[in-house]
């Protein structure tokens, strides 16, 4: 039996409110939805009140903040005003320089390209524009800042109503790919793709639109998909392991500034530990791999490694050299066996502070011997 694609949910009340309030502009715009871009199929551009345009929780630019907030404070409901205010704040803090520049551009030149919304008002792109126009309205109340130019995706009863996959592919084409716009951080890009894949969207579908990838049917394309997984998913999986070990699952903001350290652990260490030739040549036993990985995670956890290295990544990159020496490997394994035994401390920040006091000196002493 063929799988039936999951359609996005549409709030019929909000859909009708937008239908009743939209104002024609006589302009047309082509968007990369389904195969419409290649067919140059254009949509009407409308103006609608800015309050009818809503932020999506799936916004890739602030994926780290959303996931962390939901982990620490509970599930967010897209349609609730409190959720919209939280997302507005996250966007305002995401790139203050670009936000400030956009306000100046909108104030001087107005809107150019329209945003894209679902039939009930959720923004696929244009989140930063909504934020900027909302802020402009506070300081410079003006009718031209109270409406957003949009194209509206097919709605209820339309055969081309979006599926969940359609929305993921559209957002991917508009934002995640290199288009000259404000691009996601590597971590937010990883979280966006990873969430889509976990939701059942095929990674090859997401990547085949990327101009940096080759034809989807070629062997080279399959190789590049694997490289993408290694570059984005492997560090994220190590990050998830780190957060779980430290009892702060889902709190991505705690490690947002350590992405490159997880990259180094994946590319410079774990890739070698998964290589049979490397393990045989360096006498690495399979039951040592988990402890070596734990050593890498402990080195990432160090807040101050200045006594032994310029940054944690340098230490991570030394691990393959250290474990190739039987004597030095013993000290690496000792680092991996250092655990957080402060389970009685409930507050994660206090627990981490205590770990830094108790364990970091021990780790630094072992590193100095290497």
Which role does the model predict for each range below?
Residues 100, 130, 191, 227, ...:
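Non-catalytic, well-ordered alpha-helical scaffold segments
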């Amino acid at each position: 039996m063929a799988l039936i694609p999951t359609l996005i949910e549409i709030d019929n009340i909000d859909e009708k409110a937008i239908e009743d309030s939209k104002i024609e502009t006589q302009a047309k715009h082509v968007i990369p939805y389904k195969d419409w871009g290649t067919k140059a199929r254009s949509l009407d551009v409308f103006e609608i009140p800015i309050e009818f345009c809503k932020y999506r929780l799936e916004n890739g630019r602030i994926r780290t903040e959303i996931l962390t907030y939901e982990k620490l404070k509970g599930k967010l409901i897209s349609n609730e005003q409190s959720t919209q205010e939280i997302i507005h704040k996250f966007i305002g803090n995401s790139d203050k320089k670009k936000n400030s520049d956009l306000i100046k551009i909108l104030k001087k030149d107005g809107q150019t390209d329209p945003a894209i919304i679902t039939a009930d008002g959720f923004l696929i792109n244009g989140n930063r524009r909504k934020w900027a126009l909302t802020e402009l309205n506070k300081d410079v109340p003006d009718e031209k800042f109270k409406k957003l130019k949009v194209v509206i995706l097919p709605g209820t009863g339309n055969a081309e109503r979006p599926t969940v996959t359609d929305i993921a592919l559209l957002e991917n084409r508009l934002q995640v790919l290199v288009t000259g716009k404000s691009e996601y951080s590597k971590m937010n890009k990883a979280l966006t793709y990873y969430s889509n894949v976990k939701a059942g969207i095929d990674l090859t579908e997401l990547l085949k639109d990327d101009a940096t990838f080759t034809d989807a049917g070629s062997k080279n394309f399959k190789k590049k998909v694997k490289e993408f997984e290694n570059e984005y998913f492997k560090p994220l999986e190590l990050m998830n392991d780190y957060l779980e070990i430290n009892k702060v699952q889902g709190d991505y903001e705690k490690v947002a500034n350590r992405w490159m350290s997880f990259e180094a652990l994946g590319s410079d260490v774990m890739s070698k530990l998964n290589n049979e030739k490397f393990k045989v040549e360096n006498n690495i036993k399979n039951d040592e791999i988990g402890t070596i990985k734990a050593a890498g995670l402990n080195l990432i956890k160090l807040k101050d490694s200045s006594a032994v290295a310029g940054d944690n990544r340098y230490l991570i990159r030394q691990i393959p050299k250290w474990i190739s020496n039987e004597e030095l490997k013993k000290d690496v394994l000792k680092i991996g066996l250092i655990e957080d035994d402060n389970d009685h401390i409930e507050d994660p920040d206090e627990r981490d502070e205590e770990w830094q006091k108790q364990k970091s000196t021990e780790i630094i002493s072992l590193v100095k011997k290497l």
